[in-house]
Amino acid sequence: MRAPGAAEMLDLWDRSSGKTPIEKSMELLSLASPEGDPAGLSIGRRDACLFRLRERFFGPLFSNIADCPSCGERVEWSGNIRDLLVDGEEKEGVFTLYAASYVILFRLPNSYDLMNAAAYRDHSEWLLRDCILEARKQDAYCDVADLPEDVFDLLDRRMAEEDPQADISMLLSCAKCAHQWEMPFDIGSYLWMEIDSWAKRVLRE
């Protein structure tokens, strides 16, 4: 994976106008790794690549803001990209979930799955369904639509265990009211916000 130059980044920024955050992340990773298919990576592997690209572009340190959900106070916070990279082997392939009398073969979600699931109101369940390769109950094949809700709950938790990089949250604290909360950190949206600010600044100079 390489770090694209300034001219390439400006061109990418210009032609990505109007695209969704996921599509923008895919364009960026395709530019950095033209030989691969970034949309086919698990969400964790995709985000790990985005974290590393962010460090190459802007360095390891970052800052952000959030509004306290309790009192509305603006909270400023900062961190280090390297602290958000999960240690351990990046997993791919087929996994097996044993849930009571059910045996589920599944893979980890990727960006294709996220884009497909976005079309449904209950996108979380559709995302899980897309990743089930085979479902059996007492050695007989069964339809994914017939699986009970608790099996989907177990599958959701198991996917989170297998791909922890896919769900990064920051523990924030409000200095005004002392409220603490966890806020999801979406590296794709954050990185593109930085690229957008950088591109506009370059064009003004």
How should each PLM-predicted stretch be described?
Residues 1-205:
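Long C-terminal interaction/binding lobes of large macromolecular proteins
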